[in-house]
Each structure stands twice: as structure tokens, then as C-alpha cells.
Amino acid sequence: MRLLIVGAGSTGGYFGGRLAQADRDVTFLVRKGRADQLKATGLQIVSPHGDVALTPKLVTAETIASPYDAIILTVKAYSLDAALKDIAPGVGPKTMIVPVLNGMRHVDSIVAAFGQDALAGGLCSIAAALDDQGRIVQLSQFHNFVYGEMNGSRSERIEQLDAVMQNAGFDARLSSNIEQDMWNKWMFLATLAGVTCLTRGTIGDIAGAPGGADFVARFFDEVVSVASAHGHAPGASFLDPTRALLTEQGSTLTSSMYRDLMKNSPIEADQIIGDLLARGKQAHVDTPLLAAAYVNLAIYQTLRRPNT
């Protein structure tokens, strides 16, 4: 199975690098600057699960020569439109597109560009970042990749992808309910991003503040109410451990959006918070804390000066 990994940053570079190390047929679609860096230094991963150093196969949008069996989209949500244009030469009638973007807005964009049949569901969980040398540094132990057909079927193509993903150096799982899994991740991520960005603190900082745990619980309840109103109510197996994780005393947990905000970097405010707020309004769900978080992030985006 020929895989095209769109992006070789901390997410695409990590999972794609592990797949390449496991001798899977992996090519990375990258911009010229990242391509030049990878040609000079190779793709390097620094990880508690073992370091990786390899010479990756690379293409740019201008040099894609033929369709791929599967395309894994790992770009930030605000880069999706450009990525969909870039991958077009690599999409054939049987190509499967597996996005691991945050939120759910990207689903409609992919279907509009390439049709419902091209889309499969996906999500990943990893804490990683690029260092000043362009190496991918894994910041914690977890490295999970979940995928499945949006209708829950066990198609031939998804089983082929599962065979490629298994035993590739990370935790891989074929899901029979990937759409709910994607919503569950969105609920967790929206709450984590919203509360850490609003307070400029870790989960432990918030939990230790007067009223902090109650604030997080109310924020999470708003998010869950929106998901439930759209037919994606989570079960207790998600709710109970997630509530505990989000209110843990002493936790150093933060969100990637918070880390981006503190670095004056672009953020996925519209896709993670704004879209959820809009869906709440559509369903007549009252979400004052979500609204406060979105106003806060919108002001940051307005005032932000791009890094030079």
C-alpha cells in the first residue's frame, strides 16, 4: 500500500517516520523549505520509544507523479484548503484520504473536494514538537493512531490500512465507530484548549485555584451538550476518565493550542472552539463559557503579530 503523508512536522513526521522505519512504502508531501531541511539532515525522531534517523522519500505538490492508495493528512486545520489543492494530483478513483485534523469541519471540506467515497476517518494522539534543528521530539509516552470507515464497515481498503499500521512502532487501532471517536477527541481537546487558554495555566494550576475544577467541569458539560445535541453523546467510558483527567490536582497537562498561543504562533481557534460554538447555536444549546473562550482567542488572533 502506497502511503502519502501530507506534512512532516511533529505529527506527520513522527507517524510517517515510524512507518518508514518499519519498511512501509511511505512518501512525504512537504513544502520546499522542509524538503531542503530533510534532504540535508534526514528525518530524525527523538523519543522515549527509541530514536529514528532515516532518509525519507519526498515529493512537493509540483512533483506528485501518480495516485496513492492512501493519503494521510496531518496538517493544521488552517492549512487544509492549501493541502487539498496540493494533494489533488495524488488522488485517484480508489485513493483513500485519512485526515487526523482537529475538530470536524475538515470532513465537509474533503467530501466537497473529492467525494464521500474518498473519505475515511482518523485521529491521533501524540505530544511532540520540532526543535530548532528540525528534529521531531516526542514529549510524552503516548502515540496513538485510530482509523476507520465513517460508516463503520470493515472494507477491504481499511483492512489493508490496518495491516500497514499494525506493528509499526506506535499504538494503532481500527475503529468500528470512528466518527464518535473523532467527536470524543474534539470534546476533550476543545475543553482542554478552552480552559488552558482562558486561564493561561496548566490543568493542575486550574484545579488548584478556587472554583477551578468546577469551572472546567462546567466548560466540559457545555461541550458535551453540543455533541449530544448533534447525535454524538459520549458514553460513561469516555466521560468519567476524561472528567478526572481534566480536573487532576497537580497535573502539568496543557493543550497544543495553549503552547502555540504562548509562542505567538497561529492557532486553530475557529476549528476547535468556533465551530463547536456555531453548532451549539444551531442546536439552541447555551454555551457561555465556549463563547468566552472564543472571544478570548479571536482577540489573540486579531492582535497577534506573526513571528519574523
Question: Which residue ranges define each predicted feature?
Answer:
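A structural signal for isolated positions on well-ordered beta-strands in alpha/beta enzyme cores
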Residues: R2-L4, T27, V98, V146, ...
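Short, charged/polar "capping" segments at the starts of alpha-helices
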Residues: R34-Q37, V107-D108, S155
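Rossmann-like NAD(P)(H) cofactor-binding subdomain of soluble oxidoreductases
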Residues: V52-R135
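Internal alpha-helical scaffold of NAD(P)-dependent oxidoreductase catalytic cores
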Residues: P89-G90, A113-A118, Q133-K185, A190-S237
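NAD(P)-dependent Rossmann-like dehydrogenase/reductase catalytic/cofactor-binding core
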Residues: A217-T308
